[in-house]
Amino acid sequence: YLTESFFTELASRELKVNIILFDAKEKGIDKTIGMSLCVKNENMLWGRYWGSEKNIDNLHFEACYYSPIEWAIANKIKYFDPGAGGSHKKRRGFIAKPNASLHRWYNLPMDSLIREWLPKANKLMLDQINATNNEVPFKFEEPKLSNT
């Protein structure tokens, strides 16, 4: 999880101009209970991290979809990518798509296990992405993803 020191360090770097934070507060209480972290450039806003202290209906939607979309429109950002995970994205008007990530394992036995397992996991994920996109109630021009 991202710690307070992460945000303190982030605020002291030049990268902060590319970071947008959306915080959520309960009505009448001036205490942050949830937050989403997005990264931006001149044309794109990417949702990348979210967390909350409380489980409140629609808090995730507000912090990760509604507020970032509203901000992107107000700031003339052309594209919004809400981030990885979840077949729930189709209900929000987004297609499922793969996201790349980079990891390094310093434990060699673990590295070996993950290298063996990863192609199988990637195939299962692409199958799930294609199945999800077959159910979206709108047209889109993304090509089908290959399992090879």
Where are these regions (language model features)?
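Homeobox/homeodomain signature
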Residues: 28, 35-37, 70, 92-95, ...
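A conserved beta-strand-loop-helix scaffold within acyl/acetyltransferase catalytic domains
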Residues: 1-57, 136-148
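Terminal substrate-recognition subdomain of acyl/acetyltransferases
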Residues: 79, 85-148
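Acyl-donor binding region in acyl/amide transferases
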Residues: 42-104, 108
